[in-house]
């Protein structure tokens, strides 16, 4: 089989959403929730040809009769049976390809346990008969997508946030920090503070509404105290939002109180430091000679970095922590919600990358541990 003629598949499995498509494309073809649902009661839908499981949007729309599970928690796969269902759905239903005909590039969280990388490799070759595969670290792909090979990536999605310093294309594992504060926590926090205003959001269906409010109306304040004063003095920051049933709600200081939790985890009752300090701590764990390059190339990535105002606030906070004369640059590409996938698309279509694939033959000779020798 001539590899050149066949487009590689790129699959970015996030805690919240799975992004999938073809190498060389500029955006993923398929984006769907990383969920698997199973019927709560057998045989409720008699004659409906009821399936034993549903994946993605279909699971989401039938959630009333299903028990929903997220097989990826905090960026790490915890349920392999469900993960296999998500991959099956990706290949056969979303991309409509035969996985045995295409090389596949998968992404993994930073500090993904070795056993997990081996399991991913094994499933691709043994269950899906992939001709070739590769596993790449998510944050590294985001950095490539921004046209860099050195920098620090703040990657924040639905389930986890990481700060990943990268030098000449290699992540520096000793300096990677993980923060279990991400999009899902912000949605939960917004549900909580909207309840204090007298609106009740409790069910999973209502959580989706709150997530939409968060994505459409929230922003990061440059100066939190000052913004709070502005909000209490006038209604200039208030916005209205129409719920699916036609009811209109008003949201004021919640708009910036919600994402402020990223800088003050104590809002969520968490002990950890905010994203700015985590980024700084990550830089400080690196060799003193490369810090300058990291400060000047701080790249934001992932859906939870999409809040308006976040780059300016990061610039302000990191400047306050860094040495006085240090040049600090925060890069926030407009497409950063999908930059991991885009980086994968770029990498998998490079002519120089074609020798990097793990082939089925290499897997058959060496077994799953081949992944540690070829993907780093």
UniProtKB/Swiss-Prot annotation:
Catalytic activity: ATP + H2O = ADP + phosphate + H(+)
EC identifiers of the protein: 3.6.4.-
SMART domains associated with the record: ACTIN (SM00268)
Record carries keyword Hydrolase: yes
Classification via CDD domains: ASKHA_NBD_actin (cd10224)
Signal sequence segment: none
GO cellular component, one term: cytoplasm
Compartmental location: Cytoplasm, Cytoskeleton
One Gene Ontology molecular-function label: ATP binding
Keywords, in A-Z order: ATP-binding, Cytoplasm, Cytoskeleton, Hydrolase, Nucleotide-binding
Disulfide bonds: none
Family that this chain belongs to: Belongs to the actin family.
Function, as annotated: Actins are highly conserved proteins that are involved in various types of cell motility and are ubiquitously expressed in all eukaryotic cells.
Protein name stated in the entry: Actin-2
Organism: Lumbricus terrestris (Common earthworm)
